[in-house]
A protein has these predicted regions:
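Catalytic pocket-lining loop regions of alpha/beta-barrel enzymes
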Residues: 61-167
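Mid-domain alpha/beta scaffold segments of enzyme catalytic cores
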Residues: 1-79, 99-101, 122-123, 130, ...
Length: 167
């Protein structure tokens, strides 16, 4: 039941999904969240170039394929929690493989797999957008993946403008 006086109705927290202490961390989040924990967000945006947004301490390349990471994502599903992810367009195929490997976990694709349009990608916007559409279409076939429509007004990071979004 939703309490109209409650300001927060759900929490998506952070955890290192590779941690051998993942269950402990999730239990602590659940206790602190007083029943509001719904998922874990772990941004795997791995920037290859300095012109692209880099966040210190972010994920190393190839983390989607890491067996410990995949086990952590699977554990979320077992606990009824979702996995939120944010990454760049060239990581969409890796995320697709993760979604197929862990079908029991609901995954939230943040920022639609961020098709980049800055730095070395600025001159490849059309090609990137075409490949991005193919990748997103493949991801859309995974019943355990939903997309969060957010961050789309962050030009010039994206390879497209809103007028191109009709597919």
């Amino acid at each position: 039941t939703r309490d109209p006086e409650r300001l927060i109705s759900a929490i998506v927290a952070h955890a290192d999904l590779r941690s051998p202490r993942l269950d402990e961390v999730l239990e602590a989040h659940e206790a602190a969240g007083r029943g509001l924990l719904r998922g874990i967000r772990d941004a795997l945006s791995h920037a290859k170039h300095p012109e692209v947004l880099r966040i210190p301490g972010r994920a190393p390349a190839g983390l989607y394929a890491d067996p410990a990471f995949r086990a952590g994502v699977a554990r979320l599903g077992e606990r009824g929690l979702s996995y939120d992810t944010w990454h760049y367009h060239y990581q969409n195929p890796e995320m697709l493989e993760l979604a197929r490997a862990v079908p029991g976990t609901t995954m939230v694709l943040d920022h639609f797999g961020t098709p980049l349009g800055v730095g070395p990608y600025a001159s490849q916007r059309d090609e990137i957008f075409e490949q991005w559409k193919l990748d997103i279409a493949a991801i859309a076939h995974c019943e355990n993946v939903v997309a969060k429509f957010g961050g789309m007004a962050m030009p010039p990071i994206f390879a497209t403008t809103f007028s191109q979004w009709a597919m």
